[in-house]
């Protein structure tokens, strides 16, 4: 792993692990301590050759769920203030935010709300003139047609994904080496998705694979419990984490 990769990985971990504004970060929670980025950074044990810094924090981001880089080096983050359960009468207004480090100092200088009005966007992945978003029971494509970093077109790409347990709804979008979009589903979900090739079903945990240009959807792997991380190595083998693999 190169030094750049090590620094990048550590920076991303810091982004998800740390929040800077206690009042905003806790979102009215009072039963856990308020976060303290300075203290948390001081307590981290960092391996030789690695570096950790705070890239972005609340209020730039709120309860981030997933993040991915675009070819320009900007970081797209999906956030949800209502996760894991929206309250009766509450209007869903979760967001996708673009973070950019323009001066190269390792900290986000700008943040732009690319889209709002979402419901528990558990995945975001830049591509095809905008981004793909997991929006509860749907996969959306949000497009920016005029180049102002604001979504001006919203399209439902796929629908019919289960939502019995919001902790297990579809999540973690990744581009695969075959130009397909891979994403996860966990065990307490039953999905029945209509496609041009017929209804595709996944009852329980697994990994989906999707080719946007043809709307071809299939199940890449089954039998998981709480699939979360998914990455590919240099031989295109899948490396998958399961949060409850021992069950």
Label every model-predicted segment.
Residues 9-19:
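Bacterial N-terminal signal peptides
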Residues 22-247:
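Beta-propeller domains with acidic blade repeats across secreted/periplasmic ectodomains
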